[in-house]
Design a protein with these regions (language model features):
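Active-site-facing alpha/beta catalytic cores
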Residues: 74, 84-85, 89-331, 373, ...
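Non-transmembrane, aqueous-exposed alpha-helical and coiled segments at domain scale
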Residues: 323-327, 332-355, 361-408
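N-terminal amphipathic alpha-helix/helix-capping segment at the start of soluble metabolic enzymes
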Residues: 20-31, 58-74
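N-terminal signal-anchor module of multipass membrane proteins
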Residues: 31-46, 51-59, 75, 80-81
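Glycine-rich, charged/polar anion/phosphate-binding loops
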Residues: 62-64, 281-284, 340-342
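Sec-dependent signal peptide recognition
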Residues: 1-8
Length: 455
């Protein structure tokens, strides 16, 4: 198998990289839409290529340095947000509430680990979704195209034809979202002296001792005459991330940095390649091999040791720190069998990566007519992830969660949300998300574990 991988890599290197060289590998793709009009697609791409980048090269460089710190155990990475953004649920209030939730989790993780928390939101670009099947069958037997995210088509069964103009809508929504995030981050909203202002309708740290202890820590810093106007106390950085799936959109927002002359994907600070698109011959790997953003690779039990090494050599040929984040998604029943072998492979080959645990995707179950996840399984996979890294002397760099500040009933916690109450407020268009109450309770349980095992 390794021989075939190496031969394929040699063939790939014969193609000079450009933002559009992924098209040479398009025949291997099973996820991108087939647009009826290539002329309309080209027109949309030309329009987007003339628009301002959503993020800057300098922001991407800073994030890469921070992710390097997470890989070295000097920072902690938290990735969180909706499974998929939507056009109809977009609102200032939703973005503000997700921001509040990120702040609460961030400060709890920093208090727990004693490390700065890198906050990365699945937002301002997380519109496209891979699907297992290109078609779905309605109850009447009619076969229609699968919904693949608002940037591609509509959840409405009458509007499933892919429309390239939806990329323009996604770009403008992302622009508004980033404007709000930057205003919140640098306008005093994230001031740690205003913890009470981070309150949500459901889910807040004030219900436990952690809130009191964090407030006491802030009070102590004030006693040391650390200025309450210091930017460390009043400002924060929120980075954006999404799956690199819809390559015509990514290509149109690719830019060259005028200073370094390097190429960046300017649709987001951080791009990841998913389980379904990380094949060595996929166009997504080809595109990501040429941009200088920090990159994530989702890996499951299906990823072999040789495949992982080949991916790293393709996407990070210079073995740079901070470039690659390995986002593991095994499931609670498989992590013990597969994470150790991959850690050992990385150690033996002296690869530099940051490890991050995605405990969501490997724990998805069908419960009646709904896809759901059991909170206890999600937490248990996180705890096993940390225990395994501790056993191997490696750094567990971060956690990745699908979550929402809304009071949804999509994941089962055996307390407020049961199998019978899933239908009460199940609104996700794709995968089930933790609600604010669930995610904060889970992070508090993680904090208890961390203090017992790592402090």
């Amino acid at each position: 198998m390794l021989k075939h991988i190496l031969i394929f890599l040699l063939l790939q290197y014969s193609v000079a990289w450009t933002p559009g060289s992924w098209r040479h590998f398009q025949k291997y793709d099973k996820q991108m839409p087939k647009y009826k009009s290539k002329a309309k697609l080209k027109k949309v791409q030309e329009h987007l290529s003339k628009q301002a980048p959503l993020v800057s090269a300098d922001e991407c460089k800073l994030l890469k340095r921070e992710i390097e710190n997470a890989g070295r155990g000097k920072a902690f990475l938290f990735m969180g947000g909706d499974c998929a953004e939507s056009f109809d649920q977009f609102s200032t209030n939703h973005i503000r509430d997700l921001y509040k939730l990120m702040l609460q989790i961030g400060i709890l993780l920093s208090y727990t680990t004693g490390l700065p928390t890198i906050k990365m939101a699945r937002i301002a670009g997380q519109f496209a979704k891979p699907r297992s099947y290109p078609f779905e069958t309605l109850k009447n037997g009619t076969e229609i195209l699968s919904y693949k995210g608002d940037i591609i088509n509509d959840i409405d069964i009458e509007k499933r034809a892919p429309d390239p103009k939806r990329m323009i809508d996604a770009y403008h929504q992302s622009t508004q979202t980033l404007n709000l995030l930057r205003a919140f981050s640098y306008g005093g909203y994230s001031d740690v002296h205003r913890l009470d202002h981070w309150r949500l309708k459901d889910g807040f740290l004030t219900d436990n001792s952690y809130y009191r202890n964090i407030n006491l820590a802030v009070r102590f810093m004030n006693a040391l005459r650390i200025s309450d106007k210091d930017p460390v106390m009043t400002q924060t950085d929120i980075y954006t991330c999404h799956e690199c799936l819809l390559l015509p959109y990514e290509e149109a927002l690719t830019r060259n940095d005028s200073i370094s002359k390097k190429t960046y994907g300017c649709s987001s600070h951080f791009l990841w390649v998913g389980e379904r698109t990380r094949s060595l011959k996929s166009p997504h790997i080809e595109y990501l091999s040429g941009v200088h953003n920090p990159i994530g690779i989702k890996i499951s039990h299906k990823c072999s040791n040789d495949e992982l090494l080949a991916l790293l050599r393709k996407l990070n040929p210079d073995n740079e720190y901070g470039k690659i984040t390995l986002i593991t998604r095994f499931g609670v029943d498989k992590i013990q069998d597969h994470l150790p072998r991959l850690i050992q492979t990385i150690q033996e080959n002296r690869m530099f990566v940051t490890w991050c645990c995605d405990p969501m995707h490997g724990n998805t179950k069908s419960i009646g007519d709904y896809k759901s996840r059991i909170v206890d399984d999600i937490l248990e996979e996180v705890l096993q992830f940390f225990e395994i890294h501790k056993e191997h002397g490696t750094v567990p760099g971060g956690i990745h969660l699908e979550m929402t500040p809304e009071l949804v009933t999509e994941c089962v916690d055996y307390h407020n949300v049961t199998k019978e109450t899933l239908q009460d407020n199940y609104v996700s268009k794709c995968d089930p998300r933790l609600n604010a109450h669930q995610v904060l309770n889970m992070m508090e349980d993680f904090a208890d574990f961390y203090f017992d095992e790592f402090i």
